[in-house]
A protein has these predicted regions:
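Post-signal peptide N-terminal segment of mature Sec-exported envelope proteins
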Residues: 19-47
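A membrane-pore/channel beta-structure motif
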Residues: 42-48, 54, 122
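Bacterial signal peptide processing site
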Residues: 11-15
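Sec-dependent bacterial lipoprotein signal peptides
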Residues: 1-9
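Flexible glycine-/small-residue-rich
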Residues: 49-51, 64, 111, 121
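Mature extracytoplasmic domains of secretory-pathway proteins
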Residues: 51-92
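Short, exposed beta-strand-loop hairpins at the edges of beta-sheets
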Residues: 98-100, 104-121
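N-terminal post-signal-peptidase region of extra-cytosolic proteins
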Residues: 33, 45-47, 77-96, 102-105
Length: 122
């Protein structure tokens, strides 16, 4: 397992190799479901990606202020470790739309090949 936490701003990037991402996605869905419909602004953008081909599970969590800074300076880049599915979802994630969506699950995708993406606000 590789994990990195940015001290400045509280960013988290966690990369693990797993055979079954079910537990991680179940935990993430439960967290997002508890927040669904709650009042108040989002403070974090959370992304969980599983690449079936590489058996790679990537979790990214970043504060909204960093997401705003990233969008102002350019596009969101999940990095090469996030996989093709995350890069397919990325162009459809506009920060102004994300902020309007409210807390909880924003996007959930599961491809036939086993790749998965879950994006939620907390």
């Amino acid at each position: 397992m590789v994990a990195a936490a940015g001290l400045l701003g509280g960013c988290l990037v966690e990369i693990r190799h797993v055979d079954d991402p079910g537990a991680a996605f179940g935990q993430a869905r439960a967290e997002a479901s508890r927040l669904q419909g709650q009042p108040g602004p989002a403070h974090r953008v959370n992304v969980l990606v599983f690449d079936e081909g590489d058996h790679k599970l990537v979790r990214v969590s970043l504060p909204m202020w960093i997401a705003k800074k990233i969008q102002k300076d350019g596009e969101i880049d999940f990095g090469g470790d996030a996989g093709d599915l995350a890069e397919d979802v990325r162009p459809h994630l506009r920060l102004e739309d994300i902020e309007k969506a409210g807390l909880g699950i924003l996007v959930e995708v599961e491809e036939d090949g086993g790749d998965q993406v879950l994006v939620w606000l907390s």
